[in-house]
């Protein structure tokens, strides 16, 4: 399997904002606070505007790395391949390493991605993970996200859109530490 051909590039492009978006002042105020938090969590049921809020959040950052998660991304290798590809160009070698080493190479590949992000990003940036609820019960993916958040450079922020708060020790710890800006359906 050639991983670069398994990556659907359109999932890595932020959707275009709808021209009829209703902008709520309070929501804009909350979104503008995302700079103060490593992680912004937008959770609400279907149809409440999570993706729309994530699109609006993009406007606060010069560099946006987007990943729209779909059901097939429950495969950890495919998930990691998309995550790596969200930071192209410059991460092609990590796809090759993942392809050659398989799932056993994920630790070194993830470390390589963290190092790439740390040296490549020189300004505030955001990684958006839209529809994270589709993979939130995959232990390996949660561990990778935990490693990324724990070792991120200070100018990289994460935004996660999901239907419920992920029930993992890392999310609980981050919320207790005040690392998470939480936006709910009441705010949307």
Named regions from a protein language model:
Residues 44-46, 131, 160-165:
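A short beta-strand-to-loop transition that corresponds to the Sensor-1 phosphate-sensing loop
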Residues 26-27, 52-56, 139-188:
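Alpha-helical sensor/transducer elements of the RecA-like P-loop NTPase core
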Residues 40-68, 81-85:
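P-loop NTPase Walker A phosphate-binding motif
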Residues 1-31, 93-97:
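Conserved adenine-nucleotide phosphate-binding loops and their immediately adjacent elements
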Residues 116-141:
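Conserved P-loop NTPase "ATPase switch" module shared by AAA+ and STAND
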